[in-house]
Regions:
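Catalytic or ion-translocation cores adjacent to nucleophile or general acid/base/metal-coordination motifs
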Residues: 280, 289-312, 318-372, 376-379
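Helical scaffold of the NTase/Pol beta-like nucleotidyltransferase catalytic core
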Residues: 238-240, 270-297
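Active-site microenvironments that recognize anionic phosphate/pyrophosphate groups
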Residues: 1-54, 59, 68-267, 271-274, ...
């Protein structure tokens, strides 16, 4: 019954710290309002509880009656004695089941536009939003931990909040297929992403016909915090953003809802401005690493094809994880004239990567500026590298910053997005013969050594396995070729 699901969800909130004891009645009342109920009790419980309380009260002295009244008042928080208690049955691993029960009830009562994953996600995010602290409370606690304990304690609290709130849907991410592939360049991470649910045809049609809205302008804008969402934009009532200042400008810090790796975070400009790789980019990356030295942070390139999926909003990605590229050794060192204090070398990696290292980030940045400027204008016709064609620039950089012990590092990955009639999606991009595996941009995450593959490959690989075990002629099958 829905009342029991409400009790269990409030208990979950208490046990995960989303809800404080003082917020218990308030949270319960918000949930019963959402579901159109007058009370968290079923009618039978109300009658039984009233009779029992009346009998107990009549047999006690005035002071005993007062004590019983206080006990009864506390029990009325959830409508049933001892039902909502942090010490009761552990609900911390049951969120998916609790929400499913609530969503099934909502669908049965006609509270959803359609019983599909899109509308269920919109509604369960609304549910979880009722358990969330206000943004100011989250920010205050984050920075209290940052100052009084450590940056790592602050991000640990915020990461737990983002998971417990269901902003990061752990039960979906657990379904992702992950493995490691040993190569001459190191152990590469590979994942088949199953945490993004596929939209059903009705939702796709509804999104196509929905009025176009410019609010929020994109998925990274700060206006997403607390937004109810719509059929073509995810709900974010359970989302909280930590404001950070990097290189003197206001940015936001949040986690990716799909966490492709440990504590996968996104750092984004508070203004909706396009991606741009420049001097200020290097300054911002190092400023962030100085504030959060246990995290790496990098930027997608600022040109199509070699950039990420969102070029319209300036942002970085980082996290508490060491990718294969970070572990890869420098196979050839060199010294740049005038920068003898900066260690430089070419990384053993299947892409062109220059690693700069030193204790003075200003010096690293100054050398990075020179490399960027030279690469922007670099042309080598024999290697089919052109700085520009018909006025369109092609050369850019994917930069990644980190702190390693007492030194700072900056990896500069040289990128070029030139296309030809034979390779319209990019000469230095997976060619058409590989598009049955993946054809999307090779962005920051892939550059560092994590291949994020589409969900369809799960079934395709299973079909391929069955065909191989059955001894079928793979070339004779259109589906497998």
């Amino acid at each position: 019954m829905i009342q029991n699901a409400i009790r269990r969800l409030v208990r979950y909130g208490l046990q995960t710290g989303l809800v404080e004891k003082e917020d218990e009645i308030y949270t319960t009342n918000r949930l019963i309002e959402l579901f159109g109920l007058d009370s968290p009790e079923v009618q039978g419980e109300q009658a039984d509880g009233a009779a029992e309380n009346g009998a107990e009260a009549s047999g006690k002295q005035a002071d005993g009656a007062a004590q019983n009244g206080a006990e009864t008042s506390g029990k009325q928080i959830d409508g049933a004695a001892e039902e909502v208690s942090v010490d009761a049955a552990d609900e911390t691993g049951n969120l998916e089941g609790i929400l499913k029960e609530m969503l099934d009830y909502a669908a049965e009562k006609g509270m959803l536009a359609a019983d599909s994953v899109v509308y269920r996600d919109l509604f369960d995010t609304k549910i979880m939003g009722l358990l969330m602290p206000r943004p100011s409370e989250v920010i205050r606690k984050f920075y209290d931990l940052y100052k009084e304990v450590s940056p790592e304690a602050a991000t640990g609290y915020y990461y737990d909040l983002s998971r417990n709130s269901d902003y990061i849907r752990r039960y979906r991410i657990a379904r992702d297929k992950k493995w490691v592939a040993p190569t001459e360049y190191g152990d590469l991470d590979i994942t088949i992403n199953l945490s993004k649910p596929e939209k059903d045809p009705k939702a796709i049609a509804a999104a196509k016909n929905a009025p176009q809205s410019g609010y929020p302008k994109c998925l990274l804008c700060k206006e997403n915090e607390g937004y109810a969402g719509r059929v073509n934009h995810p709900a974010r009532q359970n989302h909280r953003i930590i404001p950070v200042t990097i290189n003197g400008s206001r940015w936001g810090f949040q986690y990716s809802p799909y966490v492709y790796y440990n504590e996968h975070c996104i750092v984004f400009n508070s203004e909706h401005v396009p991606m741009k790789i420049e001097h200020a980019t290097f300054c911002k990356l190092f400023d962030f690493v100085k504030q959060f030295p246990h995290y790496f942070v990098g930027s997608n390139a600022d040109l199509p094809i070699v950039g990420g999926s969102i070029l319209s909003h300036d942002h970085f990605q980082g996290g508490h994880y060491e990718f294969a590229m970070a572990k890869a050794p420098v196979e050839e060192t060199f010294r740049a004239a005038g920068f003898e204090d900066v260690e430089a070398g070419i990384v053993k990696w299947p892409m062109s990567v220059i690693r700069l290292s030193g204790t003075d980030t200003d010096r690293i940045i100054a050398l990075a500026d020179k490399i960027l400027a030279n690469w922007r204008g670099y042309t080598d016709e024999e290697a089919f590298i052109y700085a520009e064609t018909d006025g369109e620039p092609h050369n850019t950089i994917t930069p990644i910053a980190r702190k390693r012990r007492d030194k700072y590092e900056l990896d500069l990955v040289l990128r070029n997005n030139i296309t030809t009639a034979e390779h319209p999606l990019g000469v230095y991009h997976p060619h058409a013969k590989l598009h049955h595996i993946k054809k999307e941009n090779i962005g920051l995450i892939e550059v560092m050594g994590l291949a994020v593959l589409p969900a369809r490959l799960k079934q395709e690989l299973a079909d391929l396995k069955d065909a191989i075990l059955a001894g079928k002629d793979l070339r004779a099958s259109e589906e497998l070729c």
